[in-house]
């Protein structure tokens, strides 16, 4: 028994030494196979237990099983240790030196696109006025884009030369790229009871392209629905927005009669400005006027389409082009440059990352 025990001790010491010296997982796997493979040293010893008498098995069984358990534990521990070493080496290799100086060249620094900046500015202003942000799909149905918004069947906007239509589906229904963000008004009224106060920024699509128009452009509109909303409320909201957005203490606005299928009465809004200097527009002063947005009281048919009773609820809505007001505020002459992906243009007109616009800190600080 002493010779047998001595042999087991020698085997155990040899296996533990091999495990300790294993430098990687393949080496560990080789030791495991040498010990516990089909013809491994420990496996062969375990096979002998079946041929032993009960007395021999009682004496040698715990010794052999103890060897097996200790070698197994050593293999598991060494595998975990090697895994930790590998992770530490990888982390060291991929480490970023945060003490390195920042990139100084404007071309190397990322900039926020003016459209993203202006959307954040709009969200900050209307958020301060108690409005929520609403969104909807870019691909719309004819119903939400036109019918529910009181567009008659023969309206020019329904024609192929103005709107991007998809092929009709198997039911003959056709979808389209939305021509305005107004479908979100209907979707919101369908699932939310008044009072409703939302602004809706997003992409819109029309077949138009020149220095001031793009086939894809950005629009924002607002919607207020309750039992007492009126033109005076709308006028106040729009004045507060224009003062905050153009960062002027006061602004003069004039409202002109117009026509939109989804509002009655419909109005277009001009804002006072000074265009006496070439290539520059100053708001809140001067004797010139510039159209800035369209607005009106929500048409009763639109309220009905949204599931609301026009005898109980009323509201007002307005809309404007985000690209256009960005051009006016920041002096960008050509809308097409917004979408050219020119890093030189973006480094000139872009904004510093992480400087989120707030009314307290300054919208365009």
Swiss-Prot record:
Signal peptide: none
Binding residue positions for Mg(2+): 264
Co-factor: note: Binds 2 magnesium ions per tetramer.
Reaction it catalyzes: tRNA(Phe) + L-phenylalanine + ATP = L-phenylalanyl-tRNA(Phe) + AMP + diphosphate + H(+)
Enzyme class: ligase
Subcellular location: Cytoplasm
Alphabetically ordered keywords of this record: Aminoacyl-tRNA synthetase, ATP-binding, Cytoplasm, Ligase, Magnesium, Metal-binding, Nucleotide-binding, Protein biosynthesis
Any Pfam family: Phe_tRNA-synt_N
Gene Ontology cellular component list: cytoplasm
GO biological process terms held by the UniProt record: phenylalanyl-tRNA aminoacylation
InterPro entries: aa-tRNA-synth_II (IPR006195), aa-tRNA-synth_II/BPL/LPL (IPR045864), Phe-tRNA-synth_IIc_asu (IPR004529), Phe-tRNA_ligase_II_N (IPR004188), Phe_tRNA_ligase_alpha1_bac (IPR022911), Phenylalanyl-tRNA_Synthase (IPR002319), tRNA-bd_arm (IPR010978)
Quaternary structure, from the entry: Tetramer of two alpha and two beta subunits.
PANTHER family: PHENYLALANINE--TRNA LIGASE, MITOCHONDRIAL, PHENYLALANYL-TRNA SYNTHETASE
Name by which UniProt lists this protein: Phenylalanine--tRNA ligase alpha subunit
């Amino acid at each position: 028994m002493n010779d047998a025990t001595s042999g087991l001790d020698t085997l155990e010491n040899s296996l533990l030494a091999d495990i300790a010296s294993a430098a990687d997982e393949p080496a560990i796997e080789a030791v495991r196979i040498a010990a516990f493979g089909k013809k491994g040293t420990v496996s062969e010893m375990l096979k002998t237990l079946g041929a032993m008498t009960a007395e021999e098995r009682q004496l040698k069984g715990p010794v052999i099983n103890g060897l097996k358990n200790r070698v197994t534990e050593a293999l598991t521990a060494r595998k975990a240790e090697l895994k930790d070493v590998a992770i530490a080496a990888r982390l060291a290799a991929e480490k970023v030196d945060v003490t390195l100086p920042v990139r100084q060249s404007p071309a190397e620094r990322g900039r926020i696109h003016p459209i993203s900046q202006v959307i954040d500015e709009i969200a900050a202003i209307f958020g301060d006025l108690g409005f929520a942000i609403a969104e909807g799909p870019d691909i719309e149905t004819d119903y939400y884009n036109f019918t529910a918004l009181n567009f008659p069947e023969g309206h020019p906007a329904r024609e192929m030369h103005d709107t991007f239509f998809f092929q009709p589906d198997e039911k003959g229904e056709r979808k389209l790229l939305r021509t305005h963000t107004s479908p979100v008004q209907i979707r919101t009224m369908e699932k939310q009871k008044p009072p409703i106060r939302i602004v809706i920024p997003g992409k819109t699509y029309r077949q138009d392209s020149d220095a001031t128009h793009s086939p894809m452009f950005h629009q924002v509109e607002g919607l207020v629905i309750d039992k007492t909303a009126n033109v005076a409320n709308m006028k106040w909201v729009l004045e507060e927005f224009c003062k905050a957005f153009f960062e002027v203490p006061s602004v003069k606005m004039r409202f002109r009669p117009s026509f939109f299928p989804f509002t009655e009465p419909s109005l277009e809004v001009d804002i006072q400005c000074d265009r006496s200097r070439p290539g520059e527009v100053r708001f809140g002063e001067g004797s010139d006027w510039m159209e800035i947005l369209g607005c009106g009281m929500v048409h009763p048919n639109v309220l009905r389409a949204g599931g609301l009773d026009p005898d109980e609820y009323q509201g007002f809505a307005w809309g404007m082009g985000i690209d256009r007001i960005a051009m006016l505020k920041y002096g960008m002459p050509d809308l097409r440059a917004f979408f050219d992906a020119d890093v030189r243009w973006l480094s000139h007109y872009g904004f510093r990352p992480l400087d989120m616009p707030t009314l307290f800190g300054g919208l365009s600080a």
